[in-house]
Amino acid sequence: VLWRAGIAALQTDQLERAATNLRGLVQRRPTGELTPAALYWLGIAEQRLGRVAAAVDTFRSLTTRYPYHYYGVRGLERLRDETLAGSSADGSSPRSRLSFPELKLTRATVDAPELQSATLLARAGLSLDAADTAWTLLQQRSHDRGLAFLTAMALATAGDYARASRVVTNHFGEFLRRPAGNLPQNFWQLVYPRPFRSDVKAAAEANGMDPLMLYAIMRQESRFDPSARSAVGALGLFQIMPATAAAIGPSVGVGNVSNDESAMIEPSVNAAIGAALASRLLTMFDGHLAPVAASYNAGEDLARVWWTAVDGLREDYFVDAIPYSETRRFVREVLTNYASYRRLYANSTP
């Protein structure tokens, strides 16, 4: 009730009422998405009321508690807003709230013949066979988080980023949105890898795009699985529909591959079409990623209607006004992905 009342008041410019309701909701410490969402929009209400110190305190609380969450990312953007200049975030690392578990294999896992086989295969340079063997053992010993992380690294080494990402999400999901101490050095690289780099780099350069933006879309569309297929027939890393392949393929030099599934799922082909599509959508939406992501999930026509409806308001208003919950989640994830990729790789070679 407080959430609906707070957002309704914000939408009708009843800012004091919005702040009161959202503050009350935060004080109740709701579970799930409500706490970061309420903190974010409370900060907006305070900012619009001109209460700069209260807005900064609220956004800082949000970014400290949920630095990798969608609303935490948005909160950091708000702290950098010129209207909050002089009170912005200092860029320091968020306070640790969680402690990453000790990654120690159980005795039963150490003694398992499958682990010994995986070790021998890895030493022989058979990385995919080693990863498959570790994966099979993990299905039997899913409680062993040391084995889970070892399996994720083995899969990534073998180039199977789809399964590596799945293992990290399934076994260490609580660390993807909340700050934690003593994370393994390569933890975030497993969560946000850069597979098929030459293909993505070439596609990005051909379309004047940031390759990290393409990875943000790819991660949400296919989880890095080049053979991914949706229920409606979208294929590959960027989930390209045959009609899209027919329309864009010839213009990017890959020809009309709409009737050739094996060609469509080829990473270089799929990336070329996906990047061209993303570039066209970015032009259509004046460089804003949120409506581009909405177009990928719900179609260009609906995204255009929703974007027009917010009439020049900031992206955060657009995202939370999307009426389809699936599309809303999809867009939030793409934006969070992009912020995370930039955090990890902005200063590195594409």
What kind of region is each of these model predictions?
Residues 107-136:
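Alpha-helical segment of the N-proximal tetratricopeptide repeat
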